[in-house]
UniProtKB/Swiss-Prot annotation:
PANTHER family in UniProt: NON-SPECIFIC LIPID-TRANSFER PROTEIN 2-RELATED
Entry's family note: Belongs to the plant LTP family.
Annotated keywords: Disulfide bond, Lipid-binding, Signal, Stress response, Transport
Induction conditions: By salt-stress, mannitol or ABA in stems. By heat shock in seedlings.
InterPro entries tied to this protein: Bifun_inhib/LTP/seed_sf, Bifunc_inhib/LTP/seed_store, Plant_nsLTP
Protein name as it appears in the record: Non-specific lipid-transfer protein 1
Taxonomic placement: Eukaryota, Viridiplantae, Streptophyta, Embryophyta, Tracheophyta
Function comment: Plant non-specific lipid-transfer proteins transfer phospholipids as well as galactolipids across membranes. May play a role in wax or cutin deposition in the cell walls of expanding epidermal cells and certain secretory tissues.
Signal peptide: 1-23
GO biological process: lipid transport
Length: 114
């Protein structure tokens, strides 16, 4: 239950910090869409609906600004949420059979995302 509270607070924080533009992708959308990945990334459950969330996110990230927002949010989440297996996070594109134009990692330079 404590983890759910942390995730809810993180999503709320992202929604406040990243002011939405006209139909621009928000950090709240990124974290909400990828919430099904959390049990898998923490070694507490199967992949489940994670790939569907990843594919929806990719479909929503239509512009360079959207992709940079997604990258920044993923990077922040990787740093903020305890117990994430960073190797599993980096492997999500391969497991879900999608192409993400950057590595999912706390060390990713999101300013280079196109």
């Amino acid at each position: 239950m404590e983890m759910v509270s942390k995730i809810a607070c993180f999503v709320l924080l992202c929604m406040v910090v990243v002011a939405p533009h006209a139909e621009a992708l928000t950090c709240g959308q990124v974290t909400a869409g990828l919430a099904p990945c959390l049990p898998y990334l923490q070694g507490r459950g199967p992949l489940g609906g994670c790939c569907g969330g990843v594919k929806n996110l990719l479909g929503s990230a239509k512009t360079t600004a959207d992709r940079k927002t997604a990258c920044t949010c993923l990077k922040s989440a990787a740093n903020a949420i305890k117990g994430i297996d960073l190797n599993k996070a980096a492997g999500i594109p391969s497991v879900c059979k999608v192409n993400i134009p950057y590595k999912i990692s706390p060390s990713t330079d999101c300013s280079t995302v196109q």
